[in-house]
Amino acid sequence: MLFLAPGYIFPNVATPVTVAIDFAQAVKQGAYNVLDLKASPIPNPELFQPPSRIIRGPLNYLLSLPGKDIRGKLIDALNEWFRVPEDKLNIIKEIVVILHTASLLIDDIQDSSELRRGNPVAHRIFGVAQTINSANYAYFLAQAKLADLNDSRAFDIFTKGLLKLHRGQGMELYWRDNLICPTEEEYVEMVSCKTGGLFYLAVQLMQLNSEVTVNFSNFINLLGIIFQIRDDYMNLQSGTMTKTKGFSEDLTEGKFGYPIIHSIHAAPNDSQLIQILKLKTKDEVIKQYAVRYIESTGSFVYCREKLDMYLEEANETFRGLEMLLGPSKGIRAILDFLRTR
């Protein structure tokens, strides 16, 4: 039987068999004492570095696909106020983009998605197991970068942020898998965790490196809610979304998006929409019917009205922040972008 020492890293070689042979030869030749746990497990450890290129494959693939980068733009815009030094800002941006990309890798598996940004999802290319591993690796890769911020509080912020993100994701999956339509209030709470949580994690890391101590939680929470409701609306109404993710993908996923939630509650005695979600269908005829049904319950109109309401609240909060901190063209541009549909 072959024993591997604690801390042994599989080398960048073709097969596990090669690993076993090389390691066994090292032991046989006396280059490694199996009883000495402090010894190097191989005679030339520099030849056996972690195969990070392979491990990062799904992550790097998704990073290479162009996206909206709304989080990076938000960080740059907020920095008009925070004035975080460039080196620290770049670290924070890298942490956030890695976390966001890792969450997308997992989301696409959990949702059985086929397209991401108009291209095949990572797990269709690399496989489910390798993609999950790459996403998990990315979470810890982001965590390791916290050390470069030189502030012990960053780890607590990071941990709480990821716990919040996974709580939100867990509730959304629970509703979907058990065909439980949440209330509007439950949806907003979920979004505050899932979408707003990563936004706020970025803000908190920035404030560790800034003299600005103003509480941004309400404003960032509003941005997260607006972003997610808009995304749910666009999923069912936007031609652009059809090209990048597929036609009305939320229906195929069985997801309780904002317009769908309103439509179900608007006609509580009609189970048609619930039954369509249960099918998780790819049939465009059925999905087109579902979109017409959602339209018939006034849910798209309601969605636009709620977006306008949240946007007005966000703009009012933004004006208050400008009075305290000065103007921000970047934040104004983001709010204008979120108004477009």
Swiss-Prot record:
It comes from Penicillium crustosum. Geranylgeranyl pyrophosphate synthase; part of the gene cluster that mediates the biosynthesis of the indole diterpenes penitrems. The geranylgeranyl diphosphate (GGPP) synthase penG catalyzes the first step in penitrem biosynthesis via conversion of farnesyl pyrophosphate and isopentyl pyrophosphate into geranylgeranyl pyrophosphate (GGPP). Condensation of indole-3-glycerol phosphate with GGPP by the prenyl transferase penC then forms 3-geranylgeranylindole (3-GGI). Pathway: Secondary metabolite biosynthesis. Isopentenyl diphosphate binds at residues 68, 71, 100, 117. It holds the Pfam family polyprenyl_synt. Its cofactor is Mg(2+). Keywords: Isoprene biosynthesis, Magnesium, Metal-binding, Transferase. GO terms for biological process: alcohol biosynthetic process; isoprenoid biosynthetic process; mycotoxin biosynthetic process. Its EC number is 2.5.1.-, 2.5.1.1, 2.5.1.29, 2.5.1.10. Dimethylallyl diphosphate binds at residues 116, 194-195, 228, 235, 245, 255. Mg(2+) 2 binds at residues 107, 111. This is Geranylgeranyl pyrophosphate synthase penG. The record marks 139 as: Important for determining product chain length. It is an enzyme of class 2 (transferase). It comes from the Eukaryota. Belongs to the FPP/GGPP synthase family. Binds 3 Mg(2+) ions per subunit. It catalyses: isopentenyl diphosphate + dimethylallyl diphosphate = (2E)-geranyl diphosphate + diphosphate; isopentenyl diphosphate + (2E)-geranyl diphosphate = (2E,6E)-farnesyl diphosphate + diphosphate; isopentenyl diphosphate + (2E,6E)-farnesyl diphosphate = (2E,6E,10E)-geranylgeranyl diphosphate + diphosphate. The lineage of its organism: Eukaryota, Fungi, Dikarya, Ascomycota, Pezizomycotina. InterPro entries: Isoprenoid_synthase_dom_sf (IPR008949), Polyprenyl_synt (IPR000092), Polyprenyl_synt_CS (IPR033749).
